[in-house]
């Protein structure tokens, strides 16, 4: 298993975000920039950020959060999927009890 990456106040969010990459650099190719399980503790967030040259999708594994997509905010839960296209912005905040866990996939446009 690859070493987790811990980011503080990621993209201007609050608290810490832990990424657990699932693919090594050798396993990734020109079609995948990142594939990771992400954990955001209760009350923490991943700040709103814009994607340039790539797109990102989240599949929520556990928890409840507020997902912001181009200025509109939605509540998402385990089993939901989000998508942020190239040129658009998104972010999320863990508003539930316990950790928010999701799979994140970034692909080039």
Describe every region a protein language model picked out.
Residues 38, 83, 97-109:
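A short hydrophobic beta-strand segment most commonly corresponding to one strand
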Residues 21-24, 36-51, 86:
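Conserved short histidine dyad/triad with adjacent acidic residue
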Residues 1-33, 47:
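A short, N-terminal "cap"/entry segment at the start of jelly-roll beta-barrel domains
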Residues 71-86:
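Short acidic-glycine-tyrosine-enriched beta hairpin
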Residues 37-41, 50-67:
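Short, conserved beta-strand element in jelly-roll/cupin
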Residues 42-44, 53, 72, 88, ...:
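A generic "binding-loop/recognition-motif" signal
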Residues 48, 67-68, 84, 90-97:
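Short beta-strand His + acidic residue motifs that chelate non-heme Fe in jelly-roll/DSBH
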Residues 62, 70, 107:
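Cofactor-binding loop segments of dinucleotide-utilizing enzymes, especially the Rossmann-like FAD-
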